[in-house]
């Protein structure tokens, strides 16, 4: 009998101990609810925010029926970027000052006043934006940053600016020594098909620049050949171009040309003995800066959109913003701003950002890997930092050349480092009795979506081991740019993630970009109802707050109205409560 009592007592104590480790959801959020993601820098770049205006934002969220706010934190004024660095403007700097330099602290205070939960939202790989300033431009001279082909990164965190060599590194085994001094002796212009073209020798113009700023025409003679390979190829031979930046256009006019191809396939450059050289290309496209002008400004190289962007070479280029293709020798050695997870200094930096959120008093932390810092025309060439190479050889062979590395094995090593960081983060979060949430990117985990997503918006050559993460996380963000709510039941990977999260006892939150949900409240309402009625999700995350809340013209903020009036949101909230 005593033995039985002791056994029952021991079991009871063990159960109490176990329950003490379970981090319960707030009672107000233990049923289906609405959440919102606030990338506050977008709001602050548009209008100056004071504590009172921030209070009004949170009060409006609460009135709409929202119960949780996710607040993006990139480090505040200490890290520069959009608050005090190259990406800031007068409104964002004044907002930062009025909110004490760390807006997330003010956000927590305002959320508390409104009776809202608030989670910090961290994007570890978000260290700099994937666009640069033309090297010869006044802006680049005034605001130098980490180097890129074409010029310095326009916006980067202070940590990245101080440690540019800790960014994710490209394999550089294909870059010959002395490449910058090799003269360009031949250029191939490659059409996507073999149909005849109107482009002739007399139509082609070559422009150059020493610093990617305000290109100038360079009268150049060359031999011209029009041949057909897999597609039609115009070959320019007998060149001797030593210029750093070279641009090819035509003097043809009109908006309808016939010589087109994807930008990365449109042009090839050769040195002596017809040896093809590695190059980076540019045209009119730039992230966040849709048009670049080669006559009055400069170009963006290796921006990540050129693999899919089709360029028509023989349209009117007199305005400088279309009808051209440019290149420079070589490739970017590092990603624009994403840091490599294998360095302990990087992981400690990420933990500092986490600590700032916890010190601000947030209720939890959500982690996302998708970012704006990895855009490249060759995303799968990255991930070859020295610690990764060293660990690969320790495991698989000391003398293995980098060109023979198996990318799946490389991805496993990198993924282990990132999971190590998340485990460290989990310990820190749970020591504060807060909750940890992790994104599972459905698109990235689904092979069938590989051609439907932008491969450069995620670090590649890395295994994001979401199934392991479920073992130490408390909640899950379900993220997809491709799937609609109505498609979830028929999508195998979605069901796998939902099932695994359910077996782990983790609430799932459905993240949805408002512009992808439709152009009005009714379309959005239907999607919210589908997610709610599925019974598998805890909340619907409205991404993002700036589409809902904006300046009212009288010194405060209001509901914008495009995605519903306040009465419509209140009615929806009442319906969900039943």
Task: Identify the role of each PLM range.
Residues 31-48, 97, 125-186, 190-198, ...:
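Active-site-adjacent "subsite" loops/lids of carbohydrate-active enzymes
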Residues 38, 321-337, 437-453, 494-527:
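Active-site clefts of carbohydrate-active enzymes
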Residues 57, 75-123, 353, 406-432, ...:
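Aromatic-lined substrate-binding rim segments of carbohydrate-active enzymes
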Residues 61, 66-74, 466-490, 503-578:
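Substrate-binding cleft of secreted/luminal carbohydrate-active enzymes
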Residues 66-99, 326-327, 373-385, 485:
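Aromatic-lined carbohydrate-binding/catalytic grooves of carbohydrate-active enzymes
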Residues 82-86, 126-138, 152-157, 161-165, ...:
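Active-site-proximal loop/short-helix segments
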Residues 117-129, 366-370, 409-460, 506-517:
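Aromatic-lined carbohydrate-recognition surfaces of secreted/lumenal glycan-active proteins
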Residues 126-142, 437-485, 520, 526-534:
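Substrate-binding cleft/loops of secretory-pathway carbohydrate-active enzymes
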